[in-house]
Amino acid sequence: IIAGSNFIFSHINQNYPKYLDLKKKFLVIFRGINVDYFDPSITLETEENNLLSEWGVNRSKKLILLPGRLTTWKGQEVFIEALNLVNKELGHQSFYAIILGSDQGRDIYTKKIKRLAEQYRLTSQLKFVEHCQNMPLAYKLSDLVISASIEPEAFGRVAIEAQSMEKPIIASDIGGSNE
């Protein structure tokens, strides 16, 4: 049996102990990424400028990226609440933030988090981007990457992609993300 993280191993151990009792071989093999694809040295300045323009942001401010499907457990609401706190401390013009991901037809949730952004007057700083064909470039342009999941994930892929692109990551301390 192969688990993709220590979190998954612990979950199986706690919930399905018979598999361990049978003395079957059990391995933890962490999910990997293609480091040739997530290589910070591979981009063109024109691509960078085009993506920044598409997003409606420029290099004058720090860029915070939250990639992932738009769904309640991915923590976009927590992220927006945190951005509001940052604004209270640093002012409204200190950063841009991108929530990057599709709602996959869950437009009620998208409307909810957009209303929250409006409530906190974040609409000039916070952009919602549904798709990005070049995730390595999205990471490269970011100054900080966030994984704000409020429920445990099996493995924190966003974290290793960001780290491969040499970007700092702040991730929830639950599930496989903290590994």
What is each residue range found by the language model?
Residues 62-88, 111, 160:
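A conserved mid-protein helix/loop that constitutes part of the nucleotide-sugar donor-binding site
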